[in-house]
Amino acid sequence: MKISSSIFPIISIFILLSISSVTPSDSDDSDDFDDFFQCLPKQSDSSIPITDAILTPNNSSFQYIYQLRANNLRTFLSATSRPVAIITARHPSHAQAAVICAKRHDFQLRIRSGGHDYEGLSYTSDVPFVILDMFNLNSIDIDMSTETAWVQAGATTGELYYRIAEKSNVHGFPSGVCTTLGIGGHFSGGGYGFLIRKYGLSIDNVIDAQLIDANGRILNRKSMGEDVFWAIRGGGTTSFGIILSWRIKLVRVPPRVTVFTVQRTLEQGATELAYRWQQVAPKLPKDLFIRLQPEPINNGGNNKTVRVSFIGHFLGQADGLLRLMNVSFPELGLTRNDCLQMSWVESTLYWAGFSNGSSIDVLLDRVAVNKVFAKEKSDYYKAVIPKQGLETLWQVLMDIENIFVQMNPYGGRMEEISDLETAFAHRAGNLFKVLYGIQWSESEGGVNATARYVELSRRLYNAMAPYASSNPREAFINYRDLDIGSNESDETDFEDAKEYGAKYFRNNFIRLADVKAKIDPKNFFKNEQSIPPLPSH
């Protein structure tokens, strides 16, 4: 859904009234608010007035826009404060002005593109803050002569897939399964999907970028330098600046691909198959990706069991897939009836959970419809989970029920790229990455049940500790998890940051902190899990 510009009325004449509703009683603070709002028009392009893009709490559209892209109700409804303003940037100069004026008047800036941060750090803070909403900066400019595209930060993965398909049926791009992810944040943490084994991460196919630094300058790859370009690919861009756009290299895909889902319960041998999957999936040819997804179900009456789904994507036709599976993973028993052949863009709908035959127009729906209360955690596995460990996993799933697990194989292209190539350090040596999630609804307790469900997510995470990576126990930054370490909203202690930094970035953390010290030495861009400047020696 594209938000009409008509819902953003000119508010310049109402600025002072809006300020009064959020301004502390202290007169100096009042001056800061007033000065901040007066600063914005002076620092932006007057031909596209930024006043049209500013929302304050007294504006009728403020609450709607604030919650529209706040996708985790757990973080949104438990927030102790709301932004003093939302700047719905429609021009790069609006984003530049937000940086310059927030820095000048001591407001924290939170940057939101799709609003899928699992801990809500793109739209919440415990200190006075402004949201810079990139949603309207969503242009996608594809050049088929060079097989490249410039994609603005506010575009979604679904829009990107749709625009590629408009130009070609033999091109695609390796990024997320969810089609409402904002490109700005998704790529900055790495960006992965079902093409990961063939083409690596999204960032492995990024060739340039436009970044606004803490001084409000727009930098490209050449002007930012290779160190910064290295850091923003996998290091979490919001520690270094604001991504305006990425230049990507499109990848080749066949005209027809094959997808499948095979499901087996514990009674049908799912444990043996899951054990075998760990040995096979990371070593399959690059063209084949098979996700393992276990879930608890009722097997008649009150009998609980676990059903394991093997969800596959093959860059080729069904006959070739069947020949490959009969050699590499015959135990799964894949048949021709299990296979669906379709175009690559249609396969993005399959992975996103749309029904077979859905129009690709659904890729243009930009906002997640179903918002839930959720808590997510992640793991990397470097060794096969023994059957005893799988049985532990099954038991916890049956005990908790609301938990979901996704296990995504590595290998292939991920095995070939050095940990040092980009800031993303989880490469060779990993068999698979795991997402653990728990979701609940308002009827199941809503925000008041947060403590209970978060504790349940930790129970599963702790149960799998003996089998996951260790020293450090690695985690994926795009599955943000404050449990693994955090700072206060307005502080970034280096020693505290090392705790989560080592888990997200392994040995790349120190280099990231060094880059941070060069591009943002005063630490303007920060959040509870940002990268601090490396202390001087």
PLM region spans:
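Soluble FAD-dependent oxygen oxidases
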Residues: 2-537
